[in-house]
Amino acid sequence: AHTVRAVSLVPGEAPAAVLDLGCGPGAQTAALASALPEARIVAVDVLPAMVEEAGRRFIERGIDDRVVAVMGDMAAPPVTPASQDLIWSEGAIYNLGVTEALRAWRPFLKSTGTVAFTEPVWLMDSPPTEILDWWLAEYPAITDSAGVRAQVEAASFRTVASFALPASAWWEEYYGPMEQRIAALRTRLPDDPVASEVATAAEAEIDYFLRFSDCYSYAFFIVQPID
């Protein structure tokens, strides 16, 4: 639902050429394709397993005639410069940093192009020390929405619209499936120390979310180049 809402906030005509960077298994790419039935979408991820899963998803949805998954670097996507109406990135821009990513992606946008991305943000000025310390260890660059807008401006972009995702979106699309994967991992590899460490870290993240979801969220930002 939040993907569709973000699409509705993209200014101008419906984008025809769309680039989804850090696409993962392609769930939001498929949602994009539904919201933009005329668009041709290139979904990019650095992990072969993600590209394969996304490709299977597109075939199953019957959209593989206009939506393709390819392996590539989100900092240097495998598309022609000045060719994209919309660059999309959910839960992945942190790999580059907001300002750095926007500067890297700008050459691939058409003059009227738009970038839409999600970024974790604080929802309060003084979060509890426990969750503050956890986030600073996981992602030291986390800031509030005003801080993200400043990072956008530093890249010579302007924020057209933004909104925070509700806690339900985190659970339905991220932590709920994660909980299922943890259970499957523990069942499949009960004595594997690496698997156990991964599962324990993921369980800790879920616990923090359940206790502190009023302190932080992901927010969507829809931005355009200033000139």
Locate the predicted segments by residue:
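A short SAM/SAH-binding and catalytic strip from SAM-dependent methyltransferases
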Residues: 86-99
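A short acidic, Gly/Pro-enriched loop at the edge of an enzyme's catalytic core
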Residues: 75-86
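Conserved Class I S-adenosyl-L-methionine
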Residues: 163-227
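Class I SAM-dependent methyltransferase SAM/SAH-binding core
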Residues: 19, 25-76
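Short, glycine-/aromatic-enriched active-site segment of Class I SAM-dependent methyltransferases
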Residues: 120-139
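Short alpha-helix
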Residues: 141-156
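Conserved alpha-helix/loop element of class I SAM-dependent methyltransferases that forms part
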Residues: 1-14
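A short glycine-rich, Lys/Arg-flanked "PGG" loop and its adjoining helix->strand segment in the class I
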Residues: 100-114
